[in-house]
Amino acid sequence: MEKTQQQLIHEIEHIRKFLIDLGEDYPLHSHIVVSCSQKLDLLLNEFERTKE
């Protein structure tokens, strides 16, 4: 099943929220959370740019 761009954006935002919650639970690993969140931000920005 192929997902629409809007579905992918929604899933990425859900993953980001999960990562943030995980970072709060495990502060020693917050650098991993920050790195993953930044990569997801770049992906979201790319989706937004290609949507226009």
Swiss-Prot record:
One Gene Ontology biological process: regulation of sporulation
GO molecular function: protein dimerization activity
InterPro entries for the chain: HLH_DNA-bd_sf, Spo0E-like, Spo0E-like_sf
Highest rank taxon of the organism: Bacteria
Protein name: Uncharacterized protein BH0262
